[in-house]
Amino acid sequence: MKLSVLIPVYNRRAALAQCLGALARQTLGRDEFEVIVCDDGSDDQPEALGAAFGSALDLRFVRQPHANRAAALNTGFHVARGDVVLFTDSDMVPTPALLEKHRDFHRRDPRPQAAMLGHMDWYPALPLTRFMRYIVSDSAWQFGYRALADGAPATWGYFYGGNSSVKREFLAANGRHDESFARAEDVELGYRLSQAGMELVYDASAVNYHNHFVTVRDFARRNQNVGRALVQFAARHPELTGHLPIFAGAVLARETERSGLSIDGLIAQAEAVERLELAPAQEAEIVRLYEMLLSFALGQGVREALQADFEGAPARVTVIVPTGRLDEPLATPLRDRLLALERGGYEFFLFQAGRDGIALDPTTSLGPEVLQACRAAAVRARGKYLCFAHRADLDDGRLARLEAAIAGEPEAGMVSERLAAGRDALAIPRPLFFECGGFAQASGDAAFGWRLGDRLRSLGYRPRELAATVPPGGSLAG
């Protein structure tokens, strides 16, 4: 059984040299593994290290124009010849038995779906700061190993790209890294592999050291990028929307800003106390400061992603609608109306409460649970505004009224229209829907009886209800 060790690198030649040196000292024989350096368009010529390590290692360099880690890893995977793929990073220093432990695991469990997670810790020679110790503590901002037992299964969220291995054929059959992800590409791959049956097991003795000094500022910016990736993650996998801190992050970011705090200000506070000697009681205060900063940074990244334009021409309004039977074709009048409205700058998500959904053209179904479906649709939406309506109320005049009202009165935060059947249709800016927590609970009408007004008023908005209208004749419900 042969291993392929994939190392993505971008302008880290010195760190890569240390990593390759540690790989050259492995207890596993040279002919039992190959090392593929996946160069993401570096300027510092990492391939020049081949002369120093080519005799000690079965070493290859593959290069691509600068893109991201995911693309670099996929480029390396294309040339991998091993039975097992082991992912690590250029700033890691493997302990001598690391590869042997991964190889032995896969020998003991040759099943295609069996995968292994090793342990990562700071490099012993690295000078650790208070902040660096904090992010690998129970806070789990960097690594979450303290929640794992040695030899126990680990969930897909632990599929860390710095020390994990999987059978090459299983990886080839079930998807490689998604190159649209600039961050969290390893965990996103782990989720897809877990859906295909991957069983990840943790070995605490398979240690890979992280030789990377981390500053407060750099890690806070990293957390902003994680927040952006969470939104992308939920858009790609809507079934996870309720399990990711997207709504909570957006709410926290807004509330922190309203209190007069900023990321730069919190970073400055954290940096100022980094070198101070503190009493135990003061240490607890510093932990709260770190937690506030990193949570705020993550939430700010969520907000930025929610406010950013999506690729392509975004719709003006995303309309989210509970529909009738999803196992029957849409009635022709409704289908024609949706197609016409889509051409006019609207997009639609339809779902049915209480049962599994199926894909519909030109719409997308979102599954059985109303709140979950609304959250998932909001994350995937491309529109500047969200409109929640009933399928019998998909009148372009009504949608146009709601859009014009919310666009013309941003201070309202939300506009709604009470319909003859006692239902509400409402429109709200997409980022604001997240910042006020979305639909927290249902009340009144089983489908759309939620009330966002109180939360919006607490944020200083003045929600407005439009004059009641009578639904047009000739229902489009079909």
Model-derived features: where do they sit?
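A conserved hydrophobic helix/loop-capping motif in glycosyltransferases and polysaccharide synthases
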Residues: 3-15, 19, 26, 38, ...
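A conserved acidic beta->alpha catalytic loop
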Residues: 22, 39-48, 92, 325-327, ...
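Short, acidic, metal-binding catalytic loop of nucleotide-sugar glycosyltransferases
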Residues: 22-32, 333-345
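Glycine-rich, basic loop-to-helix element that forms the pyrophosphate-binding segment
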Residues: 64-80, 364-380
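Short aromatic/hydrophobic "clamp" motif used to bind/position activated sugar donors
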Residues: 85, 386
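Conserved donor NDP-sugar-binding/catalytic core segment of glycosyltransferases
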Residues: 97-132, 393-420
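Short, flexible, basic/aromatic active-site loop/helix in glycosyltransferases
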Residues: 119, 135-156, 410-423, 433-434
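Active-site-adjacent helix/loop segment of glycosyltransferases
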Residues: 200, 204-287, 473-478
